[in-house]
Amino acid sequence: MKQYLITGGTGMVGSQLVNEIKKSDSHITILTRHDQISNDKKISYVNWAKSGWEHKVPQNIDVVINLAGATLNKRWTPEYKQTLMLSRIQSTQALYELFKSRNKAPKALFNASATGYYPPDLFMSYTEVYKTLPFDFLSDIVYQWERFAQQFEQLGTRVVIGRFGIILSNEGGALQTMKLPYEYYIGGKLGSGQQWYSWIHINDLIQAILFLINNESASGPFNLTAPIPERQNLFGYTLARAMHKPHETWAPSLAMRLILGQMSTVVLDTQKVLPNKIQALGFQFKYSNLKMALEDLIKE
């Protein structure tokens, strides 16, 4: 039986990942910030906001999956920016300290990250060979998160970094936010509309995470995005058609930056990111183009 330890296991990605892992011969320990009782013999919860939580984590953990982090979908006040950073690096450091104090380290760590690692560019295509240093707040979060995760290599753990694109899911996240203006017939171009949206269907993301965990030759950063990214204007048009709504309005960049503040970088300052590394290992995307993904997620 494979033993998993998961942070962020009750979130959008984590909950679906847990449901998929349960299909195998496994036991899952989920770290949460509140007391929770499990009715499933394959799942147990540990409240790591409480002192002594480390002693409740099983000794024989095989795989750690670290998804914990405060949502980006809130206004980035100075206080919340600190929360965005600390929620990621403190949880990762706590995991590292836990296993550093033990005789047995996990075989593999999967640590979430984001395509915000790469600088915004309208023409560059980014693959995993591209290396950079932080250039803005979001890239600094990603850079520090990955750096803290890489400490696990000192323990002999295989470290896999998953740089998530825009996750398309019916259970929350970006798609629900994107759909909202179209539901009120005010959807359209954002800024120039030429910025890239590197997206991924939630089902492909879950399968990609499991593929990387189970592939012993997988290590380092992986771009977890669909093979065919889209520019925002075409993305919006495709979404509008799937919803049978118009795609006619325009929100200028200046207005969006005034309304959203620094959070506007998530929708305006984006990158064209390609999943070359995971494809080279043989992973096949079920939803490789946006039309196919949205038709699956937006049913009549």
From Swiss-Prot:
Upper classification of the source organism reads: Bacteria, Bacillati, Bacillota, Bacilli, Bacillales
The chain's coiled-coil residues are none
**Source species, domain of life:** Bacteria
Q: Where are the transmembrane segments?
A: none
Q: Which family does it belong to?
A: Belongs to the NAD(P)-dependent epimerase/dehydratase family. SDR39U1 subfamily.
What is the organism of origin for this protein? Staphylococcus aureus (strain NCTC 8325 / PS 47)
Recorded protein name is Epimerase family protein SAOUHSC_00792
